[in-house]
């Protein structure tokens, strides 16, 4: 094929290649990937909204939501790696290599200072607020107090402000008057857990499975294919550069809603491999890979139940609920450990570098669990004409879909049963003890 004709076909190849990639971007996935109906109507409550409602005899008392920030720009590190790859292509691109030439001509518009919330991310939060208000109108009624907290990261603070703005004048406070409490102790508990930082965050060997997969046959095949498309020796690429090209495809889709020319480098099978690489990192750094990943989140889990307890006590005393709406904005790294602590999305076999094929139908897919704007919502209800035990019930929603409780396989649980199921975590998971560095003969011991 002549170079000119091949270059003309590139847009078509991009469109075809990217059509099936959106579901494989892991933690860089759009929220619409888990709720496709929002692509048509961002305020839709979805086809099964009515089925998730409780009987009229049950009135919501409190909503506690833990959110991931909305769509963000790439990190500074990702932008540096992209600049490195883009620079190589600009230096080496030849007219006879249309894919490389097209990418070399691609405008590198990212800047390291962009490590913040994208405009799309603000809309994510505004629309989420409006949908939650429509789903739970009694809780979001006028003169209801909203307690809004966030991690100290700018993208989270911006997301919190956008969430409040999405509610408009529906609450008693003006859009700019609700203060956002910075609470890194709960939203970035992982930074405050010495054991996690020492044994996982700062320990290269903790990511052994991730690094092994980068050097494994599946990634080698993808790398060689990308190198061939770019007319580069395979030795000039590595797994990190291939991954940043794939992530650029994801960012262009999430931020600009456009199909990036970078997407043309990857087939759906390539995307599955790169998704697994992302999931391996999430699994070993934030999920079930090490107990400390999830146990460090017990401080947040316990706080959720302390607030639910308080609401139950106030209701029993016929007092107004002091905190009917509690919304906290954190990160994928906030939600993933919390869900692992609760036992969700756990596979029978651990994710490892050598079982990619066997994990084709795994539960642990980070893009399905914690995409941009992911949200875990606890709703406490008071139900009339019930026994004392059944008077208070709880519903959990992940990304606006009711979750099944482990102990009942139902989407509604009595509050007493839920507390009983998680009794060990609520009573015996002490953050200071869990996160304390173990010492042997006066020196820190490595437990991993």
Swiss-Prot record:
Question: Tissue range of expression?
Answer: Present in growth plate chondrocytes but not detectable in articular chondrocytes (at protein level). Spatially restricted to chondrocytes in the lower portion of the proliferative zone and the upper portion of the hypertrophic zone in the growth plate of long bones (at protein level). Weakly expressed in kidney, liver, lung, skin and spleen, and not detected in brain, heart and muscle.
- The principal location of this protein is endoplasmic reticulum
Which residues does the entry assign to the active site, renumbered to this chain?
69
Known catalysed reaction(s)? Answer: 1D-myo-inositol hexakisphosphate + H2O = 1D-myo-inositol 1,2,4,5,6-pentakisphosphate + phosphate; 1D-myo-inositol 1,2,4,5,6-pentakisphosphate + H2O = 1D-myo-inositol 1,2,5,6-tetrakisphosphate + phosphate; 1D-myo-inositol 1,2,5,6-tetrakisphosphate + H2O = 1D-myo-inositol 1,2,6-trisphosphate + phosphate; 1D-myo-inositol 1,2,6-trisphosphate + H2O = 1D-myo-inositol 1,2-bisphosphate + phosphate
The Gene Ontology CC terms held by the record are: endoplasmic reticulum lumen; extracellular space; plasma membrane
What triggers its expression?
Repressed by parathyroid hormone-related protein PTHLH/PTHRP.
CDD domains noted in UniProt: HP_HAP_like
Q: Which molecular function term from Gene Ontology is one that the record holds? A: 3-phytase activity
Q: What is its EC number?
A: 3.1.3.62, 3.1.3.80
Query: Which cysteines in this chain are paired by disulphide bridges?
Result: none
Name this protein carries in UniProt: Multiple inositol polyphosphate phosphatase 1
Which source organism does the UniProt entry give? Answer: Gallus gallus (Chicken)
